[in-house]
Swiss-Prot record:
One of its GO terms (molecular function) is rRNA binding. Keywords: Ribonucleoprotein, Ribosomal protein, RNA-binding, rRNA-binding. Belongs to the bacterial ribosomal protein bS6 family. This is Small ribosomal subunit protein bS6. The gene is rpsF.
Amino acid sequence: MRKYEIMYIIRPDMD
């Protein structure tokens, strides 16, 4: 998993 993928899962509002 990539860093941005983890961030996206944690904060899906970060379109």
